[in-house]
C-alpha cells in the first residue's frame, strides 16, 4: 500500500487555485432528488470544481438519510380535511406519516381527538 505524501496547506491552496476549485462555506444539507426517493446529506463538505466551462460539485462527509417520496394529491388532502375536520397542513402531515393511506390518516386524526 502506497502512502501519500502530506501536502502543506500553502501547496494545497495553490493547487486548488490552479484547478479553479473552491469550497462552499455554510452548507447545511444537500438533497439529491430521484423519482422515487431522496438522499439527504447533512453537514456536507461541498467543493466546486470548474473545468472546461463546466461546474462540478463534489460532496463529501456528513450524515446521510434516505427517504421515499410520497405523492399526495390535493383531492386526498381535501378528503382527509373533510372527514377528520382538520386544516390543510394537519391533513397533509397525516397523509405523509401514513405513506398516503387515506383510511389510516383519517383514523389517526379522529382517534387522537384533533379538531
Swiss-Prot record:
Tree of life domain: Archaea
InterPro entries registered for this protein in UniProt: NAC-like_UBA (IPR044034), NAC_A/B_dom_sf (IPR038187), NAC_arc (IPR005231), Nas_poly-pep-assoc_cplx_dom (IPR002715), UBA-like_sf (IPR009060)
Any one of the GO BP annotations: protein transport
Domain NAC-A/B residues, every copy: 6-72
The UniProt record lists the keyword Phosphoprotein: no
Keywords: Protein transport, RNA-binding, Transport
Keyword field contains Transport: yes
MF terms in GO: RNA binding
Annotated SMART domains: NAC
One family name in Pfam for this protein: NAC
SUPFAM superfamilies: UBA-like
Subunit-structure text: Homodimer. Interacts with the ribosome. Binds ribosomal RNA.
Protein family according to the UniProt entry: Belongs to the NAC-alpha family.
NCBIfam families to which the protein is assigned, alphabetical: archaeal-type nascent polypeptide-associated complex protein
Purpose of the protein: Contacts the emerging nascent chain on the ribosome.
Annotated protein name in UniProt: Nascent polypeptide-associated complex protein
Biological source species: Pyrococcus horikoshii (strain ATCC 700860 / DSM 12428 / JCM 9974 / NBRC 100139 / OT-3)
Lineage: Archaea, Methanobacteriati, Methanobacteriota, Thermococci, Thermococcales
Gene: nac
